[in-house]
UniProtKB/Swiss-Prot annotation:
This is Chondroitin proteoglycan 8. The lineage of its organism: Eukaryota, Metazoa, Ecdysozoa, Nematoda, Chromadorea. Glycans are attached at residues 61, 63, 84, 88, 109. It comes from Caenorhabditis elegans. Residues 33-96 are annotated as: Disordered. It comes from the Eukaryota. Keywords: Glycoprotein, Proteoglycan, Signal.
Length: 115
């Protein structure tokens, strides 16, 4: 009976993992959003104000995008606004979110001693 329970648990975890993986936004979409926001931030200040007004209208209008895409656009826009306020030394978003993180043993951790 125990092997059947373990098999059922394995199958349910596999199904849940596949469902979660399908909901992740593909890397190409993330890069496209980043390029669009960078191009918009390079334009003049007058058009930036118009772009900001346009994006707030489309965000609330239910443009047919998934909630993950809308949230991603908001995050990228917020990062660009913060970067433009910090000046020339501002950091730029250059990578996509990490989907899986493997545990890494940092120097000194896991040794169990305080020396």
């Amino acid at each position: 009976m125990r092997p059947f329970i373990l098999l059922a648990l394995l199958v349910s975890v596999t199904v849940a993992f596949n469902i979660f993986r399908d909901e992740v936004v593909p890397e190409e979409q993330l890069l496209a959003v980043r390029r669009t926001t960078r191009d918009a931030s390079d334009s003049s200040s007058d058009s930036d104000e118009k772009d900001d007004a346009k994006t707030t209208v489309t965000d609330g209008s239910g443009s047919g995008e998934s909630p993950a895409e809308e949230q991603l656009r908001r995050v990228v826009r917020d990062v660009d606004e913060e970067a433009s306020g910090e000046g020339s030394g501002a950091a730029e978003v250059t990578s996509v979110p990490v989907r899986f993180v493997r545990s890494v043993d940092a120097e000194g951790s896991g040794s169990g001693s305080d020396e």
